[in-house]
From Swiss-Prot:
<feature type="glycosylation site" description="N-linked (GlcNAc...) asparagine">
    <location>
        <position position="286"/>
    </location>
</feature>
<keyword id="KW-0378">Hydrolase</keyword>
<feature type="binding site">
    <location>
        <position position="105"/>
    </location>
    <ligand>
        <name>substrate</name>
    </ligand>
</feature>
<feature type="propeptide" description="Removed in mature form">
    <location>
        <begin position="604"/>
        <end position="625"/>
    </location>
</feature>
<feature type="binding site">
    <location>
        <position position="370"/>
    </location>
    <ligand>
        <name>substrate</name>
    </ligand>
</feature>
<feature type="disulfide bond">
    <location>
        <begin position="51"/>
        <end position="59"/>
    </location>
</feature>
<feature type="glycosylation site" description="N-linked (GlcNAc...) asparagine">
    <location>
        <position position="180"/>
    </location>
</feature>
<feature type="binding site">
    <location>
        <position position="143"/>
    </location>
    <ligand>
        <name>Ca(2+) 1</name>
    </ligand>
</feature>
<dbReference type="InterPro" id="IPR013780">
    <property type="entry name" value="Glyco_hydro_b"/>
</dbReference>
<dbReference type="Pfam" id="PF00128">
    <property type="entry name" value="Alpha-amylase"/>
</dbReference>
<dbReference type="InterPro" id="IPR006047">
    <property type="entry name" value="Glyco_hydro_13_cat_dom"/>
</dbReference>
<dbReference type="GO" id="GO:0005509">
    <property type="term" value="F:calcium ion binding"/>
</dbReference>
<keyword id="KW-0472">Membrane</keyword>
<feature type="glycosylation site" description="N-linked (GlcNAc...) asparagine">
    <location>
        <position position="440"/>
    </location>
</feature>
<keyword id="KW-0326">Glycosidase</keyword>
<dbReference type="GO" id="GO:0004556">
    <property type="term" value="F:alpha-amylase activity"/>
</dbReference>
<feature type="binding site">
    <location>
        <position position="253"/>
    </location>
    <ligand>
        <name>Ca(2+) 2</name>
    </ligand>
</feature>
C-alpha cells in the first residue's frame, strides 16, 4: 500500500475514530445485497481466462474486476456487495476439492489472499463503492482453519497465528444428524483432502485474537457489515463480544431449514440468512409438495419461532454458493422470475447471488453453482437483469413513500397450491407457479385498496382501477408474476430506475412495454419528490393481527379463481436490535448501547470529527511528503 493510504488510515486510528461510521441494523434494512464469488465474478482486464463449468481451481476474478463492474451491479439497483473471504487461503490443489478459489480455506489471519489482488486493489474497490453510496459486506471466518489431509498427518505449523493444536478443539468429524450441540459446535468439517480444524473459540486466547482481528479489519478497510460463516457450528455465546468488537451489522449463516433451529441464534446476532423462507420459495414456485400453502405455513412458523426479534433484517435469498442454482431445480423462466420477484419484495434484506440476473446455469453441487460470469456476459438488456432492476426500483419507491415499509407486516390475502396474493404496505403481488407455456389464468382479488384507486402493474407497465369493495381483476399471463402499486405514488419511480432500457426477448416476457422502458420518462419530471406519503399508510392492511383462518372459496379448476381476503398477516418488527459500539482498551472490548436519538447525535458528531480529521490528514500527508 502506498504511504498516503496508510497514513490516512493511521491518522484516524491515532485519534481513536473509525475510518467509516458503523452501519446499524436499522440502516441495513434499506439495503439490497449482491453476493459475488470474487474469483468467478469479473477479471480486471479485457482478457477472459478459461474457466470451465465444473472448474475447481482459481479462474482469475479479482477485487479490481468487481470494481470494473460496479456500474453493472449498481445499474440493477443494488447498494451493497457481499464479497468472498479476503484472508490468505491454503495454496495448492487437493484432489477433487481443487483449490481455495472460494476463499473458505483460510490459513493466515494476518495476510490477504493475493489471488484476488493487492491491498490497494481492495481499498480502491471499497473507496469507489462508498463514493457511490454502496456498502461492503465482508465474509468473516472464525470457526475453523484449513489443513491439508489426511487426518493421520495433521500439522498446524503453517497456520497463523494458531499454529498449535492447543488452539483447536480435539479432532472428531462432525455428525450433522446429531442432536448434541457440543458435537456440532466442536467437531471438524471437511474431508481427507482438506480438513477444516475447529477453532476453540471458548479459549480466551483464541477469542481475544478473533475479536481484535475483526475489529482491526473493520477499521482498516471501512467495512459496513459482516456475514459470519458457519454459525451453526459455533458456540453462540461467542457472538455478542465478537459482533461488538466488529461494531457493524452482523448476519450469520444459519444453515438449517428448521425455523426453531434457525432462530435459536437470533438473540446473539443482528440477523441470520433465512433458509426456511428459501425452502418455502423453492417449493412454492417449483410446484413441489404443498407449494404456496407450504410457503405461507413456513413463513408463519418462522415468524413465530423468532417472535420478538426484528424480522426486517433477515437475509432472504434464492441462490448462494452452497446451494444449487435455481435453474437446476426448474427450467421454467416464469417460475424462476416469480421466485426472484417475490424475494425482492418480501420482508427482510434481499440477497441476489451473482449471475441470477443472467439466468446462469448450474448443477446441484459445487463447483457447478459457481460458474465464471464472464463466460456468459454482462448483458444489461437481459430479461432477468431488467426484471430485477424494476423490482428493486419498486422496493426503493415503497421505502421512500413510507418510513415503516421495511418493518410493515406482510399479509397473505389468499393462497393455495398454485398461487398466492401477498400485500406488504402498498405493494400487492400476485404470484403463481404456472409454467411459461400455460394458458392465461384470471383471478378476482380482494386487494384491500380503496375503491377507484388506480394501480400500475409495474412489470408489464399497465394500469387498472380497483373496483367495488377493493376488487381487482387480475389476468396472469404465461405464469408471470403481477406486482401492483398505486399510480399516484410512483412520482419518483423513474429516478429509482435510473437509465432506462427495455426488456430483450426471452422465452417468458411481459405482454407490453416494460416498466423500465417507459416509466422513467413518464415520471422523471417529478423524480425529485422524495417526501413520505401520508396517504400510503392510511390505505395499508398489513398491520392487523395474525389470523390462522384462510379462505375456502378458491377454486382450483378452470382458468378463473375468485379470491377473498383472509388477512393472513405476518408480523415483522419485533424488539429492534442495534449494533453496539465498541470501546477498545489494550486487552479487551466492552460493548455499550444507546438510544436511537443518542445514536443519531453521535453519528452526526462522528461525521463532523471525520470531516475535520480528513482535512487534517490531507495536510499531514502533504507536509510529510
Amino acid at each position: 500500500m502506498g504511504f498516503s493510504k496508510i497514513a490516512l488510515f493511521s491518522l484516524f486510528a491515532l485519534f481513536g475514530l473509525p475510518t467509516s461510521l458503523a452501519k446499524s441494523s436499522e440502516e441495513w434494512r434499506d439495503r439490497i445485497i449482491y453476493q459475488v464469488i470474487t474469483d468467478r465474478f469479473a477479471v480486471d482486464s479485457d482478457n477472459t481466462p478459461d474457466c470451465s463449468f465444473d472448474d475447481s481451481s482459481y479462474c482469475g476474478g479479482t477485487w479490481s474486476g468487481i470494481r470494473s463492474k460496479l456500474d453493472y451491479i449498481q445499474g440493477m439497483g443494488f447498494n451493497a456487495i457481499w464479497i468472498s473471504p479476503v484472508e490468505k487461503n491454503l495454496e495448492g490443489s487437493y484432489g477433487s476439492d481443487g483449490e481455495a478459489y472460494h476463499g473458505y480455506w483460510n490459513t493466515d489471519f494476518t495476510q490477504l489472499n493475493e489471488h484476488f489482488g493487492s491491498e490497494d486493489d481492495l481499498i480502491d474497490l471499497i473507496t469507489d463503492m462508498h463514493n457511490r453510496d454502496m456498502w461492503i459486506m465482508f465474509d468473516a471466518l472464525a470457526n475453523s482453519m484449513a489443513i491439508p489431509g489426511p487426518t493421520d498427518n495433521i500439522s498446524y505449523s503453517n497456520l497463523v497465528p494458531f499454529n498449535d493444536s492447543s488452539y483447536f478443539h480435539p479432532y472428531c468429524w462432525i455428525d450433522y444428524g446429531s442432536n448434541n450441540n457440543t458435537d456440532i459446535e466442536d467437531c471438524w468439517t471437511g474431508d481427507d483432502n482438506v480438513i477444516l480444524a475447529d477453532l476453540d473459540i471458548e479459549s480466551t486466547n483464541v477469542a481475544d485474537y478473533l475479536h481484535e482481528h475483526i475489529h482491526d479489519m473493520v477499521e482498516r478497510y471501512q467495512i459496513d457489515g459482516i456475514r459470519i460463516d458457519a454459525v451453526k457450528q459455533m458456540n453462540p455465546e461467542f457472538f455478542p463480544n465478537y459482533t461488538s468488537a466488529a461494531g457493524v451489522f452482523a448476519i450469520g449463516e444459519m444453515f438449517s431449514y428448521d425455523p426453531n433451529v434457525s432462530c435459536s441464534v437470533r438473540n446473539y446476532l443482528d440477523s441470520i440468512t433465512s433458509y426456511p423462507i428459501r425452502q418455502g420459495i423453492e417449493f412454492a414456485f417449483n410446484y413441489t409438495g404443498a407449494a404456496f400453502e407450504y410457503l405461507q405455513e413456513i413463513d408463519t412458523q418462522f415468524q413465530q419461532a423468532c417472535e420478538g426479534q426484528d424480522m426486517s433484517v433477515i437475509g432472504n435469498f434464492l441462490e448462494n454458493h452452497d446451494l444449487p442454482r435455481y435453474t437446476s431445480i426448474t427450467n421454467d423462466t416464469s417460475q424462476d422470475i416469480g421466485a426472484i420477484v417475490f424475494l425482492l419484495l418480501h420482508t427482510g434484506i434481499p440477497i441476489i447471488y451473482y449471475g441470477e440476473e443472467q439466468r446462469l446455469p448450474g448443477g446441484s453441487d459445487t463447483p457447478e453453482n459457481r460458474a465464471a460470469l464472464w463466460n456468459y456476459g454482462y448483458d444489461t438488456d437481459a430479461n432477468y437483469y431488467q426484471t430485477i432492476r424494476t423490482a428493486i426500483a419498486l422496493r426503493k419507491q415503497a421505502i421512500s413513500d413510507s418510513d415503516s415499509w421495511t418493518t410493515d407486516s406482510h399479509s397473505y390475502l389468499d393462497y393455495d397450491l398454485r398461487h398466492a396474493v401477498v400485500r406488504k404496505g402498498d405493494v400487492l403481488g400476485v404470484y403463481t407457479n404456472y409454467e411459461s407455456s400455460s394458458d392465461n389464468v384470471t383471478y378476482d382479488v380482494s386487494s384491500n385498496f380503496d375503491d377507484g384507486t388506480v394501480l400500475r402493474e409495474v412489470l408489464s407497465n399497465t394500469t387498472t382501477t380497483v373496483g367495488s369493495s377493493g376488487a381487482l381483476h387480475v389476468t396472469v399471463v404465461s405464469g408471470l408474476p403481477q406486482v401492483y402499486y398505486p399510480e399516484a405514488s410512483l412520482t419518483s419511480f423513474g429516478n429509482f430506475l435510473g437509465t432506462a432500457t427495455s426488456y430483450s426477448s426471452a422465452s417468458a416476457s411481459y405482454p407490453s412495454t416494460s416498466m423500465s422502458a417507459s416509466l422513467s420518462s413518464v415520471h422523471t419530471s417529478s423524480a425529485t419528490s422524495s417526501s413520505k406519503s401520508s396517504s400510503s399508510s392510511s390505505s395499508r392492511s398489513g398491520s392487523s393481527s395474525s389470523s390462522s383462518s384462510r379462505s375456502g372459496s378458491t377454486s382450483s379448476s378452470g382458468s378463473s379463481h375468485t379470491i377473498t381476503s383472509t388477512s393472513q398477516s405476518v408480523h415483522t418488527s419485533g424488539s429492534s436490535t442495534s449494533t453496539s459500539s465498541v470501546a477498545v482498551t489494550s486487552t479487551a472490548y466492552s460493548s455499550s448501547s444507546s438510544s436511537s436519538s443518542s445514536s443519531s447525535i453521535e453519528s452526526s458528531a462522528n461525521a463532523v470529527r471525520v470531516s475535520i480529521l480528513g482535512v487534517a490528514a490531507f495536510i499531514a500527508i502533504v507536509l510529510f511528503i
